[in-house]
């Protein structure tokens, strides 16, 4: 048994089939591929048109490209999903999707813990990873992120998770882990727009931030 929840902000507005979160009961997934998991994000096809499958294949590819650069990255797993109308009892679609690793698991793989904080200064970020991170965001044309603060002043960051040693001591470095690549120039989804304050006309324009 699992619980399915809608998630995302932009994609809930743009997609007829938005991304979802799967919540598992630990006892129900023992011995399965999902053992030990309690919650996973699933990226879906967004709209019924088959061309939208290509956008999310490209997004999944972005995650895997970053896996080659650093271990401080989200791993993903592709799926073929049968969606069934539980009222009619009919299979409505067989579509591509992918799962995103939980941020706690990313931290654990790297001997760290996920960090929840309102904001951080740039000097706290681990320099080598930040260099790789920034160049990767430029390469894929990602403008929709912040590793220092989020839209909610009580929560850092925007499309970035933080991992760090715990307890966090003065001088300890923090590692940024990016996610949500659907609005990048690499994917170039029809609903993707650059942030207004950057003064760009298209997400396919590159800007080093």
Model-based region annotation:
Residues 1-209:
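Phosphate/dinucleotide-binding and metal-coordinating scaffold of catalytic cores
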């Amino acid at each position: 048994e699992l619980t399915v929840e809608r998630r995302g902000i932009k994609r809930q507005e743009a997609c007829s089939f938005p991304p979802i979160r799967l919540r598992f009961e630990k006892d129900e997934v023992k011995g399965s591929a999902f053992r030990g998991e309690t919650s996973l994000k699933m990226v879906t096809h967004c709209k019924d048109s088959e061309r939208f499958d290509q956008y999310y294949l490209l997004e999944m590819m972005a995650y895997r490209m970053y896996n080659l650069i650093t271990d401080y990255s989200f791993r993903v797993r592709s799926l073929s999903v049968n969606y069934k109308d539980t009222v009619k009892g009919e299979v409505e679609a067989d579509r591509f999707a992918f799962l995103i690793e939980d941020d706690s698991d990313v931290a654990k793989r790297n001997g760290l813990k996920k960090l929840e904080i309102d904001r951080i200064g740039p000097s706290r970020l681990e320099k080598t990873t930040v260099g790789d991170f920034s160049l990767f965001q430029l390469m894929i044309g990602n403008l929709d992120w912040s590793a220092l603060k989020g839209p909610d002043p009580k929560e850092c960051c925007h499309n970035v998770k933080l991992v760090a040693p715990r307890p966090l001591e003065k001088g300890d470095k923090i590692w940024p882990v990016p996610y949500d690549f659907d609005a990048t120039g690499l994917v170039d989804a029809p609903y993707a727009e650059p942030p207004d304050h950057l003064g760009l006309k298209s997400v396919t324009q590159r800007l080093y931030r």
